[in-house]
């Protein structure tokens, strides 16, 4: 990617590159900063070696993410780059980062990325900048420039920012601030713009998508948003970060009634046992887990279910973990992500007693992965012999088509690998939907033959 200025403003001296760590919310922030700098005449380049300024957009959710962020910061400062640190680590450690790494030229908080051009201008003048709001309040709308890589054919669409929950293990409310939703009109406007750019799939994201609109409309309004988005000419609309409390009859009906909202439910349940959920400060969830999963399966038989889990939470006993394994076996999720509890300073769980040893936590993670691999393999093998609609995203070095069915979300799930008879114009397949016959499956991916472009 090399992004040239889209306007007639005089080119600035700095050539800027971005290094991104973390989730898709962070990625959207990066894309907005790229768009804002481009608007102001800066040359934004994906080749960090060619840049003299690197903006490292960091993650501070867990320790491993912080370590990766620090590695990148040090890598670029050691190369003599002028480094600006953005994102969650800047928000989290706004008073410590520049003291510990004095080579850093500037900090930008999670609610301040719209100021990137002004921050860079000050850095160019030799100033050390700390632009971090105490409480993040900003959320970009469709009017804020954004660079979207159209070669990926998929774009994330942020519908809200921040979180009003206080889960015991999670530091996100401190890093991202309180929930603030965009209007339905703003979101639909951006979706239409993405459709005009050739985007084939949009993925709705926020900290809790099912709480969308509570702050501005006085009640959760995801169902109304989905009904409006279903009118936008984008083939696939996917939703991430849905919570059981928000999967109302109206929301489920919107999934059923809309042709372009794919029946893919990303439900970060974290655990199944009531005792553990209570310790996580999610006591409301235990009674809902069973009923909402059964309801989704009953109402939408083609539904794909994904969840994320935490093992090794303080106080998690053997019987709690066995309850979790039984829960997985009973509900047979299509996809599961599992993480070991990471104690975070500033969260309620940091000081909880009855810590689970790292060895036990690691073994439990491996156990969950093993159980889920068997389930996922059975799920995937059930598609063998069927025809599926596949979005082709790239061409492999072996001249195979690499894509996804609606069953797979990008980055976190598997892929579909397809052979094709006519290899002359393979590039014509990129960004297109094809019909494919599935002939083989393993626990992660599907394999088959391309039948035709749809």
Curated annotation (Swiss-Prot):
Gene Ontology MF terms: 4 iron, 4 sulfur cluster binding; aspartic acid methylthiotransferase activity; metal ion binding; protein methylthiotransferase activity
Transmembrane segments: none
Catalytic activity: L-aspartate(89)-[ribosomal protein uS12]-hydrogen + (sulfur carrier)-SH + AH2 + 2 S-adenosyl-L-methionine = 3-methylsulfanyl-L-aspartate(89)-[ribosomal protein uS12]-hydrogen + (sulfur carrier)-H + 5'-deoxyadenosine + L-methionine + A + S-adenosyl-L-homocysteine + 2 H(+)
Enzyme class: transferase
Protein's GO biological process: tRNA modification
Note on how the cofactor is bound: Binds 2 [4Fe-4S] clusters. One cluster is coordinated with 3 cysteines and an exchangeable S-adenosyl-L-methionine.
EC number of this enzyme: 2.8.4.4
Cellular localisation: Cytoplasm
Keyword Iron-sulfur: yes
One GO location term (cellular component): cytosol
Cofactor(s) of this protein: [4Fe-4S] cluster
Chain ranges of the TRAM domain: 381-452
CDD domains the UniProt entry points to: Radical_SAM (cd01335)
Keywords, sorted A to Z: 4Fe-4S, Cytoplasm, Iron, Iron-sulfur, Metal-binding, S-adenosyl-L-methionine, Transferase
A Pfam family hit: UPF0004
Keyword Cytoplasm: yes
Residues annotated to bind [4Fe-4S] cluster 2: 163, 167, 170
Residues where [4Fe-4S] cluster 1 binds: 23, 59, 88
Domain MTTase N-terminal: 14-125
Residue ranges occupied by any Radical SAM core domain in the UniProt entry: 149-378
Family: Belongs to the methylthiotransferase family. RimO subfamily.
Protein role: Catalyzes the methylthiolation of an aspartic acid residue of ribosomal protein uS12.
Protein name: Ribosomal protein uS12 methylthiotransferase RimO
Organism: Prochlorococcus marinus (strain MIT 9215)
């Amino acid at each position: 990617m090399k992004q040239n200025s889209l306007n007639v403003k005089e080119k600035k001296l700095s050539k800027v590159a971005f290094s991104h760590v973390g989730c898709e919310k962070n990625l959207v922030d990066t894309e907005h900063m790229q768009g804002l700098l481009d608007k102001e005449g800066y040359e934004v380049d994906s080749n960090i070696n060619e840049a003299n300024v690197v903006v490292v957009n960091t993650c501070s959710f867990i320790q491993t993410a912080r370590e990766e962020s620090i590695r990148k910061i040090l890598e670029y400062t050691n190369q003599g780059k002028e480094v600006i640190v953005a994102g969650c680590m800047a928000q989290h450690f706004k008073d410590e980062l520049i003291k510990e790494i004095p080579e850093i030229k500037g900090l930008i908080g999670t609610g301040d990325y719209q100021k990137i051009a002004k921050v860079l201008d000050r850095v160019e003048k030799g100033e050390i900048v700390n632009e971090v709001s105490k409480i993040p309040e900003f959320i970009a709308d469709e009017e804020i420039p954004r660079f979207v890589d159209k070669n990926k054919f998929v774009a994330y669409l942020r519908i809200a920012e921040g979180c009003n929950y206080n889960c015991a293990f999670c530091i996100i409310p401190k890093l991202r601030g309180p929930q603030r939703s965009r209007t339905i009109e703003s979101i639909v406007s951006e979706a239409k713009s993405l459709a005009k750019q050739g985007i084939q799939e949009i993925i709705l994201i926020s900290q809790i998508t099912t709480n969308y609109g509570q702050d501005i409309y006085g009640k959760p309004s995801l169902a109304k948003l989905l009904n409006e988005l279903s009118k936008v000419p984008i083939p696939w609309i996917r939703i991430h970060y849905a919570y059981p409390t928000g999967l109302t009859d109206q929301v489920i009906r919107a999934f059923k009634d809309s042709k372009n909202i794919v029946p893919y439910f990303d439900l970060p349940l974290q655990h199944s046992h009531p005792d553990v959920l209570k310790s996580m400060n999610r006591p409301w969830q235990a009674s809902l887990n069973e009923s909402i999963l059964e309801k989704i399966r009953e109402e939408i038989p083609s539904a794909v279910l994904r969840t994320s889990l935490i093992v090794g939470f303080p106080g998690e006993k053997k019987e709690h973990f066995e309850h979790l394994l039984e829960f997985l076996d009973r509900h047979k999720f299509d996809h599961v992500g599992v993480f070991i509890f990471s104690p975070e300073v500033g969260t309620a769980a940091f000081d909880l007693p009855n810590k689970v040893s790292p060895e036990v936590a690691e073994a439990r993670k491996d156990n969950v992965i093993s159980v889920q691999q068997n389930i996922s393999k059975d799920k995937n093998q059930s598609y063998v012999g069927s025809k599926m609609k596949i979005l082709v995203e790239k061409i492999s070095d072996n001249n195979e088509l690499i894509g996804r069915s609606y069953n797979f979300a990008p980055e976190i799930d598997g892929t579909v690998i397809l052979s094709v008879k006519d290899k002359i114009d393979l590039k014509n397949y990129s960004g297109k939907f094809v019909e494919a016959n599935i002939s083989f499956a393993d626990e992660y991916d599907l394999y088959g033959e391309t039948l035709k472009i749809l």
